[in-house]
Amino acid sequence: HLFEHLMFGGSLNIPEYDMPLQIAGGENNAFTNNDITNYYLTIPSENIETGFWLESDRMLELDFSQKTLDTQKKVVIEEFNQRYLNQPYGDAILQLRPLAYKKHPYRWPTIGMDISHIEKVDLEQIKKFFFSHYAPNNAIIALTGNITYNTASELAKKWFGPVERRKVLRRNIPSEP
């Protein structure tokens, strides 16, 4: 979940991710679950190339700064507090997961089991995660709206073609007893 937030912190070329998207009439959001992180844009079809540019650029040159990491840690810790600690029975799901799953990664909430998991993350761990998961060969682009397959394919090649393919970490998921 923390990494989802960091993806909106800008890239080396585009320090404010939201600004060019909003100028193009678009908006964005994301969600994370145990299997995927889904980043999505809603943008007028005449500005679709702006979306490709933004997505490929942050996959290519995400800005790994300590300042952004520190800021987003605070945001995610506040989310953790609001969602799990400041609500009656809010932490019930945190207690339930390890009872349901003994070995499987589903035992871990995407936000972390407790605040210390968020606090302990450092910039090197963030970089390692990025370079072992965020690559064109580990991404799915889904488009709907007023765009043809040929146009989508051409734009994907244009904007993601130059992004280096990476050795993607494959999860070895243990079976439950």
What are these regions (language model features)?
Residues L6, G10-S11, G51, R83-P136, ...:
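Scaffold signal of the M16-like zinc-metallopeptidase fold and its non-catalytic homologs
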